[in-house]
Amino acid sequence: AIFKSYCEIIVTHFPFDEQNCSMKLGTWTYDGSKVAINAESEHPDLSNFMESGEWVIKEARGWKHWVFYACCPTTPYLDITYHF
């Protein structure tokens, strides 16, 4: 799959600014008892990443989250969020 990500750009300290972006992968329909979401690695595979001459990714990491909502406090909803 190919994913495109956009993040808010803050250029207060241009040209020395740094941005923090995230991409969350999960399901809104199925809970953790019906869907297994696992990351292959804490660091995403960037082999197909298209580099830009204007910026670089300094670091990229991912975490798995279990979220419990008030409607169903014993049912986990899972996602993997990558921060870069």
Swiss-Prot record:
The keyword Transcription does not apply. Glycans are attached at N20. GO terms for cellular component: postsynaptic membrane. SUPFAM superfamilies: Nicotinic receptor ligand binding domain-like. One of its GO terms (molecular function) is transmembrane signaling receptor activity. It holds the Pfam family Neur_chan_LBD. It is a multi-pass membrane protein. It catalyses: K(+)(in) = K(+)(out); Na(+)(in) = Na(+)(out). InterPro entries: Neur_chan_lig-bd, Neur_chan_lig-bd_sf, Neur_channel, Neurotransmitter_ion_chnl_CS. It is found in: Postsynaptic cell membrane; Cell membrane. Its main location: membrane. Keywords: Cell membrane, Disulfide bond, Glycoprotein, Ion channel, Ion transport, Ligand-gated ion channel, Membrane, Postsynaptic cell membrane, Receptor, Synapse, Transmembrane, Transport. The keyword Isomerase does not apply. Disulfide bonds join C7-C21, C71-C72. Upon acetylcholine binding, the AChR responds by an extensive change in conformation that affects all subunits and leads to opening of an ion-conducting channel across the plasma membrane. One of the alpha chains that assemble within the acetylcholine receptor, a pentamer of two alpha chains, a beta, a delta, and a gamma (in immature muscle) or epsilon (in mature muscle) chains. The muscle heteropentamer composed of alpha-1, beta-1, delta, epsilon subunits interacts with the alpha-conotoxin ImII. Belongs to the ligand-gated ion channel (TC 1.A.9) family. Acetylcholine receptor (TC 1.A.9.1) subfamily. Alpha-1/CHRNA1 sub-subfamily. This is Acetylcholine receptor subunit alpha. It comes from Crocidura russula (Greater white-toothed shrew).
